[in-house]
Amino acid sequence: MSKETSYPKELLCADEKVVYDAIVVGAGVVGPCVATALARKGKKVLIVEREWSQPDRIVGELMQPAGVRALRSLGMVQAINNIDACSTSGYTVIYNGEKISFAYPYKADLSPPEKIPDLVFDGNDKVVDDGTISAKEFEEDEREHGVGFVHGRFLQNLRAICAAEDRVTRLQGNVISILRNDSKEVIGAKVDVPGRGKVDFKAHMTFVCDGIFSRFRKELSTTNTSKVWSSFVGLSLHHADLPTKHHGHVILGSEHMPVIAYQISSTETRILCAYNYPTLPKNVPEWLQKEVQPFIPPSLRKSFDAALESKSYKCMPNSWLPASQNNVTGLCVVGDALNMRHPLTGGGMAVGLMDVVLLVKTIGDMDFSDREEVLNELLGFHYERKAHACVINTLSIALYSLFAADSYYLKKLQKGCFEYLGRGEDWVRQPISFLSGVLPSPYLLTKVFFTVALYSVLINFRGRTPLGFLLAIYEGFAIIFTAAKVFTPFLYEQLLQ
């Protein structure tokens, strides 16, 4: 079978003579949500994806409660159903073998997820029962829930929901370039379509959602490029015995980099091992054996060793990218193409989906042919999204700096953070709300972060001799300075970019 005939016909026959209301570039997590939402708002949408078959990736597998709430607002939450997904009810942190656990926030402490008109109907904002997901647990439990899943299965569900919309046309093809007119305004995309060659498709608005390795974020800014400071090595553990069921796990220690573990199906657990450099060690299996395996909790050791023996692993760079302002007529960049954070906290999908919710509320009811008015609203969108994006993004890099502590004072902060979280629910309520993505307050995040820093200073005085007490005073100033150094620049960048 030739390449030209190997794709379903319906993915190749988009009409280039039509001027679409919107072209969506990319059908990852964010793209289908944008396309579905706009179609339900009455827009004629073309969504272009290079490969519609199910991907095999280790990104986007743990969704925080804020992401689930956003899916409810979009009427797409049933994308987590029938994919052997696993609910998550909180986090467990293990520090040098000592364990603390905390649950996600109470629903009563939050406003209900917003039901966006035209998007939510016929109960599509409710989770349903399947083999691994309990509707009662999600809908009636007093606390919020997150969910872990195999990324590709979730993605195919999102794409299926998108494909069911009459106003959505799907196209298989490789977007070569973003089209502009003589005034440098974006007017569509040039797509290399199998069997048709290079075809120009026109639209009033073009939404770039092409993910981590975006080719087209440069259409907004050629200088705002992503930075990579560290990497994750991912392994699949089968029939693993997690220390706390239905929890995400962060495994910390004074002698090793962070390790993240969470269940993604009834039989599979993902484990991500941090490597504090952008390029991986030459011998990854040897590094895993020597630098990671000794610190794996006993209950996970058997499945981890089996994964090591298979020598099957995947690697991912941990990228950082502040958002550029959407200031080009006819163009909107959204998702990881716009903004990236460290994946340690699992907040990426939450930010992207909350951005889609805000985007639809901002421009969903507008006439996209009035492009300058849409652009004016997108300028407001840039600032309004900062509340949730700033918290999740800044928290991700600040926590990674603490959890991957590679200096004396960062280790002091790491120990203080763990002990702070262990003081009980009253102390952990706001931190877990930040981690869940449901407390979009940069002010409160700053307050809590420096409260943790001050607590680290306080416990550093314990058991000191008189001479040691004087040293602790000096170290206290150094701890606060270190905290400011790892937190303030990123907060500043997020708020003022």
Swiss-Prot record:
It is found in: Microsome membrane; Endoplasmic reticulum membrane. Its EC number is 1.14.14.17. GO terms for biological process: ergosterol biosynthetic process. InterPro entries: FAD/NAD-bd_sf, Squalene_epoxidase, Squalene_monox. FAD binds at V29, V30, E49, R50, R57, R159, V175, D336, M349. GO terms for molecular function: flavin adenine dinucleotide binding; squalene monooxygenase activity. Its cofactor is FAD. Keywords: Endoplasmic reticulum, FAD, Flavoprotein, Membrane, Microsome, Oxidoreductase, Transmembrane, Transmembrane helix. It is a multi-pass membrane protein. GO terms for cellular component: endoplasmic reticulum; endoplasmic reticulum membrane; lipid droplet. The record marks Y91 as: Important for enzyme activity. Belongs to the squalene monooxygenase family. Catalyzes the stereospecific oxidation of squalene to (S)-2,3-epoxysqualene, and is considered to be a rate-limiting enzyme in steroid biosynthesis. This is Squalene monooxygenase.
